Amino acid sequence: MKILTRIPRRLLPWLLGGALALVAVSFAPALLSHETVVQIRVANSGTPLPDGFYLYQQLSAQGVRIKSITPSGDALVIHFENEEQSLAAQKVLRRLLPQGFVVAAGHQASQQNQDANRSIYS
């Protein structure tokens, strides 16, 4: 409490405001992240995953903008900037991939493996 008595009262609101601003700035990137994810998994064991570069080419040819494609264990995780791109990619992938693949959508799917993986294409 000695520190608070040494600080002039007129500076106290500015210091508290600055501290709140620092907290807000540190949490802003997490709150503003609207990245969506589509995950492609194999339905039957023994079937290899599709080639990430092939998927990138096919989605790009259909006008879908991909942020990155990342392997995640037994799945490929495709990151998109917004929900519209994700929905368009799901439609294309369901037409493009044969029956043995599962296309699942979600916000930040497979978050636990995201840091351990490297981006293949971005």
From Swiss-Prot:
Record topological domains on the Cytoplasmic side: 1-10
Protein name in UniProt? Modulator protein MzrA
Instruction: Print the keywords alphabetically.
Output: Cell inner membrane, Cell membrane, Membrane, Transmembrane, Transmembrane helix
Q: Which family does it belong to?
A: Belongs to the MzrA family.
Which NCBIfam families does the UniProt record give?
PRK10629.1 (NF007915)
What superkingdom does the record give?
Answer: Bacteria
Give the source species. Pantoea sp. (strain At-9b)
Q: Where are the transmembrane segments?
A: 11-31
Its quaternary organisation is: Interacts with EnvZ.
Membrane topology (Periplasmic)? 32-122
Gene name as annotated: mzrA
